[in-house]
């Protein structure tokens, strides 16, 4: 059953759907997101022949690439591109985390995003990419056309607007309709979930606040909820709102949120 949550703020937004790998701990706890080492503020530094932009938790950053393409970099994310970006005939970036890309059209210079074990190739379009450590990589297309392939160099899959591709740890690509009700909530400062799996909700919260996520019951992973809430509030406020839903018990301690049966 779907459970509705009253929210402090709601937003109509596009949503990126994503899939996370389950890591089962020694005590049977299912860890779906791990805390990472992040900078205290957004940084942009030269690293050899590359430029690296990194964001801390609970922060987004707008990046203008040399070709005029724009990237909205999500919380706890890292974007890397060569200092001579595009001069060799290919515009290529590497992403860890999540980002919204608005790519300037250039028929002579394809734009390629390397993320985890996935490669996304475009000429000019708007799309979201999500690829945190320990998770499957995914891309959602808003407009235009993209080709998605795994790092093993297999045949690419074409996406049409409103669809997503998910590449699992074996390199298999699954293409399906995206849950467009909440894909871009983070770009508008909102958590926006409509009949979404609790695992997906919690992993998004984990990536925003940079906290680990651990489920103490596998059955809770697939519980579906409606949850709209501002990202500007504290983690404690978000967990209180989730506890008010009554679907599970949410507790934070030692850098990790634990989700248990009530």
Model-derived regions: residue spans:
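A residue-level detector for the "anchor" residue at the start of short, highly conserved motifs
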Residues: 2-6, 11-262
């Amino acid at each position: 059953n779907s459970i509705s949550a009253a929210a402090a703020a709601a937003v109509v937004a596009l949503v990126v759907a994503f899939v996370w790998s389950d890591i089962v701990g020694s005590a049977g706890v299912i860890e779906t997101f791990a805390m990472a080492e992040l900078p205290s503020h957004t940084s942009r530094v030269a690293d050899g022949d590359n430029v690296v932009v990194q964001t801390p938790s609970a922060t987004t950053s707008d990046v203008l690439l040399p070709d005029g393409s724009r990237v909205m970099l999500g919380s706890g994310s890292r974007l890397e591109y060569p200092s001579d970006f595009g001069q060799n005939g290919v515009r290529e970036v590497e992403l860890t985390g999540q980002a919204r890309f608005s790519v300037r059209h250039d028929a002579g210079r394809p734009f390629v995003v390397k993320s985890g074990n996935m490669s996304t190739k475009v000429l000019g379009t708007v799309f979201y990419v999500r690829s945190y450590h320990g998770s499957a990589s995914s891309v959602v297309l808003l407009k235009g056309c993209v080709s998605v392939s795994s790092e093993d160099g297999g045949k690419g899959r074409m996406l049409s607007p409103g669809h997503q591709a998910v590449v699992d740890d074996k390199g298999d690509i699954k293409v399906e309709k995206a849950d467009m009700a909440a894909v871009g909530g983070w770009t508008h400062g909102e958590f926006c979930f409509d009949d979404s799996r609790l695992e997906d909700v919690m992993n998004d919260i984990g990536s925003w606040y940079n906290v680990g996520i651990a489920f103490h019951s596998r059955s809770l992973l697939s519980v579906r909820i409606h949850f709209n809430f501002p990202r500007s509030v504290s983690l404690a406020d978000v967990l209180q709102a989730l506890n008010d839903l009554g679907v599970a018990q949410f507790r934070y301690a030692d850098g990790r949120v634990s989700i248990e049966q009530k």
